[in-house]
Amino acid sequence: MIIEGKIIKIAGPVIIADGMRGAQMYEMVRVGEQKLIGEIIELEGDTATIQVYEETAGIQPGEVVESTGGPLSVELGPGVMGSIFDGIQRPLELIREESGDFIARGVDAESISKEKKWTFKPVAKVGDKVKGGDVLGEVQETSAVLQKILVPPMIEGELTSIASEGEYTVLEDIAEVATDKGDEKIQMLQKWPVRKGRPYVDKLDPDVPLVTGQRAQDTFFSVAKGGAAAIPGPFGSGKTVTQQQLAKWADADIVIYIGCGERGNEMTEVLTEFPYLDDPKTGNPLMDRTVLIANTSNMPVAAREACVYTGITIAEYYRDQGYDVALMADSTSRWAEAMREISGRLEEMPGEEGYPAYLASRLAQFYERAGRVNTIGTTSDVASITVVGAVSPPGGDLSEPVTQNTLRICKVFWALDASLADKRHFPSIDWLQSYSLYVDSIEGWWAENVAADWRETRDQAMILLQKESELQEIVQLVGPDALPEADQATLETTRMLREDFLQQNAFDDIDTYCPPVKQYNMLKTILLFHKEALAAVGRGVPIQNIVALPVKEEIGKMKYIPQDEFAAKCEEIQAAITKQCSEA
């Protein structure tokens, strides 16, 4: 039943309508003569408070508000992958054809083409007992993604018919299931409410790392598949480039990139770069396994909340098909600011720094939809969603509410430091402030796939970096020459760790991605230099002789050695370290 109310008050993106008795919380509505998209966020008697996902200028009291009878939902099916959407899943390319470079108000574009035909290959057979999550057939959506057409959750019964191999639109019936409540026809298109998490059987321990090819993240502060990581940092510290690197190189099957309230130029960079980047694993365009959701800072604030939920719902859809998904949200602070603005318009009691009291629970709702799970269905797959959220604290203040509430939920914290960025140390991850609570759980994977002593090597390097900060305090008081020569050797090693290992050039063809085995061998080589340097100092060799060794230059160039030549070159460098330190 369609309910029609009338606008009685307008306050920016918040509208109050009368005559809405019978409407439901979070129901989607059409506002005014231009049919703007909105969502009911509060109900009291006959009046409904609506947040509008489009610009409300020009709307007048007395205009009609129509309910749609359902919550804000996304369309899921073939055609999602490789698309560029706005915050409420309208395809930006179609909108540009309709209304030009700026999104016209009330524009309605189909999220997924209803006319395009897809080649469907059936997998299930008539007579099979099926339930939610079972695979009915397959569609080659892009060169990189084989989409599995699943039985929607909540449907269970006997398959009475299934389409033969051929071309179908997403609205054509491809199967019919006889359930206890009658026959259910199934299409390739599914709709799902964005605020409701898709079901799974159970969550698993996150014990497999998400390999990103970035040395600082992989070796020292790993995130596990199904984990949640936060990247807080002030302006200009490299949050966006760090997230773009993860989107390009992380070993996830699917990447969802949400630009939530960020500068238009940054999203433009992503939109222009990604379609021309090749996926390192398949050689296909990276866009073939990426969904971009662009919601720039000049778009209506209410849509920021929607874009985060839209992104995580699309991620869950591909997770249900057995894929590992990486979701980048840049930045959750802008979403929190949108919540603060709408909360203020609703005249709610403010919490810390004006943010609403429910800030923590909203952040938790989002991050807790990450996880490594057993998917629903007769044959359960292991799949994951890894969430990486950027946080933009004003002035780089990590004690502000969004950062602190995010830290309570995320187990990985990559703190970006403006002073490191000013020194052109990128990625500017502060190794003293950052941490990962997944190191213990993923240690077994590294021992099995890279080296048995990976943890020991990593911890040894971390201890040296922490010791450097203690020694630097003394150096600033009395200068480096006053230190014992063994400590001077330690400072030389930590300089190499910082400059030759932690620094990584995102724009260099070779250094942009560093495989785990190469990371381990680079670290092992630097620590071998440390061991041999200490031994030489113990024999009475002056520290100046060790600092001047030619092999140091070779160690500095290790990051630029191509992968196929690295093993042989690494052995040469290690032999040269031992030889030159013994002859120094």
UniProtKB/Swiss-Prot annotation:
It holds the Pfam family ATP-synt_ab_Xtn. PROSITE patterns: ATPASE_ALPHA_BETA. GO terms for cellular component: plasma membrane; proton-transporting two-sector ATPase complex, catalytic domain. ATP binds at residues 233-240. Its EC number is 7.1.2.2. It catalyses: ATP + H2O + 4 H(+)(in) = ADP + phosphate + 5 H(+)(out). Keywords: ATP synthesis, ATP-binding, Cell membrane, Hydrogen ion transport, Ion transport, Membrane, Nucleotide-binding, Translocase, Transport. It is found in: Cell membrane. It is a peripheral membrane protein. GO terms for molecular function: ATP binding; proton-transporting ATP synthase activity, rotational mechanism; proton-transporting ATPase activity, rotational mechanism. GO terms for biological process: proton motive force-driven plasma membrane ATP synthesis. It comes from the Archaea. Component of the A-type ATP synthase that produces ATP from ADP in the presence of a proton gradient across the membrane. The A chain is the catalytic subunit. Belongs to the ATPase alpha/beta chains family. Has multiple subunits with at least A(3), B(3), C, D, E, F, H, I and proteolipid K(x). This is A-type ATP synthase subunit A. It comes from Methanobrevibacter smithii (strain ATCC 35061 / DSM 861 / OCM 144 / PS). The gene is atpA.
